[in-house]
């Protein structure tokens, strides 16, 4: 049911001008009541804390308390919160919204585990040590929307100093990752954590990944096991290993662009992909042909030639409310 609109005029409007660095951003007006698209729009949809109480937080203690319950709630993060700590557990029916580009969690990440209906938007998460988990982790949970976030660490340390940036594992389902700046990291995004977890993951891990900017990554853009993925209109700059489809995963890969990197789309162990209108740069698609040719939701698809200008400077913490 894809609505294949190659709306170049809209892309030009969003980009304004060709941007060479994410420091030049294009603000986009958003509403706290926005709801998810992609796979997160399925299974009843993802509305987060819509209709619940609104709380603004600026400290670690305030934040951990505000996000913990399963009651409907909107938590607005004001400023940078720094704490070297384990992932904070997020309750169901939660919207976590960064007030502006200064809303950053540094040293600790988020864990959505055995929950549902969570939105994380306009939030920075950075430099979470491996001992403290991933920047954003989703496990045994469904209907999660990660949008306009900025997740990063650095590559000054070895690959095991930090863990993942966005890891969706243990049968996570109906998740959308969109408009997010994923950068400066070794192992970026892991969807399905183990070759031996097929009994749990098969039939789940339905994930949309769209309009993200991935820059200076070594691998996992993403690494995708067992599930069903729709990856479209993402821009990859200097990503060594891009999309790795594995263990029977079926991916629909459309309108993505790579600059730098030799392995844009590949499979290390029996994953599959249908690829349409991608610009693989200096690399090539070596993934076996898959069977996923459509998805159960409508979406707007940019031509590959319009993706860079539409994504760079728009992905990341660029929303205003």
Swiss-Prot record:
Q: Which residues are glycosylated?
A: 93
Entry keywords, A to Z = Calcium, Carbohydrate metabolism, Cell wall biogenesis/degradation, Glycoprotein, Lyase, Metal-binding, Polysaccharide degradation, Secreted, Signal
Residues bound to Ca(2+): 134, 163, 167
UniProt-listed Enzyme Commission number(s): 4.2.2.2
Which residues act catalytically here?
Answer: 220
Renumbered to this chain, the signal peptide range is: 1-20
Q: Name one GO biological process term.
A: cell wall organization
| Major location category of this protein | secreted
Identify which top EC class this enzyme belongs to: lyase
Q: How is the cofactor bound?
A: Binds 1 Ca(2+) ion per subunit.
- Which family does the similarity line name? Belongs to the polysaccharide lyase 1 family.
Question: What exactly does this protein do?
Answer: Pectinolytic enzyme consist of four classes of enzymes: pectin lyase, polygalacturonase, pectin methylesterase and rhamnogalacturonase. Among pectinolytic enzymes, pectin lyase is the most important in depolymerization of pectin, since it cleaves internal glycosidic bonds of highly methylated pectins. Favors pectate, the anion, over pectin, the methyl ester.
Q: What is the protein's name according to its record?
A: Probable pectate lyase A
Give the source species. Aspergillus oryzae (strain ATCC 42149 / RIB 40) (Yellow koji mold)
């Amino acid at each position: 049911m894809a609505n294949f609109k190659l709306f170049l005029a809209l892309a030009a409007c969003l980009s304004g001008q060709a941007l060479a660095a994410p420091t030049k951003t294009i603000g986009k007006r958003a509403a706290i009541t926005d709801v998810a698209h992609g796979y997160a729009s399925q299974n009843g949809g993802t509305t987060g804390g819509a209709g619940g109480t609104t709380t603004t937080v600026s400290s670690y203690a305030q934040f951990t308390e505000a996000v913990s319950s399963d009651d409907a709630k909107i938590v607005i993060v004001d400023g940078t919160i720094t704490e070297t700590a384990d992932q904070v557990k997020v309750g169901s029916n939660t919207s976590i919204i960064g007030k502006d580009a200064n809303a950053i969690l540094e040293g600790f990440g988020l864990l959505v585990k055995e929950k549902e209906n969570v939105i994380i938007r306009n939030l920075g998460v950075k430099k979470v040590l491996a001992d403290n988990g991933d920047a954003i982790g989703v496990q045994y949970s469904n209907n999660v929307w990660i949008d306009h976030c900025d997740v990063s660490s650095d590559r000054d340390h070895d690959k095991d100093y930090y863990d993942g940036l966005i890891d969706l594992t243990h049968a996570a389902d109906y998740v959308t990752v969109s408009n997010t700046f994923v950068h400066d990291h070794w192992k970026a995004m892991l969807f399905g954590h183990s070759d031996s977890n097929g009994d749990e993951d098969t039939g789940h891990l339905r994930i949309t990944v769209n309009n993200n900017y991935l820059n200076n990554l070594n691998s996992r853009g993403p690494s995708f096991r067992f599930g069903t993925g729709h990856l479209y209109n993402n821009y990859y700059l200097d990503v060594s290993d891009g999309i790795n489809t594995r263990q029977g995963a079926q991916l629909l890969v459309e309108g993505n662009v790579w600059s730098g990197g030799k392995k844009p789309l590949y499979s290390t162990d029996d994953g599959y992909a249908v690829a349409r209108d991608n610009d693989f740069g200096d690399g090539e698609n070596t993934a076996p042909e898959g069977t996923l040719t459509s998805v159960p939701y409508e979406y707007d698809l940019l031509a590959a030639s319009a993706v860079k200008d539409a994504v760079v400077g728009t992905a990341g913490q660029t929303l205003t409310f």
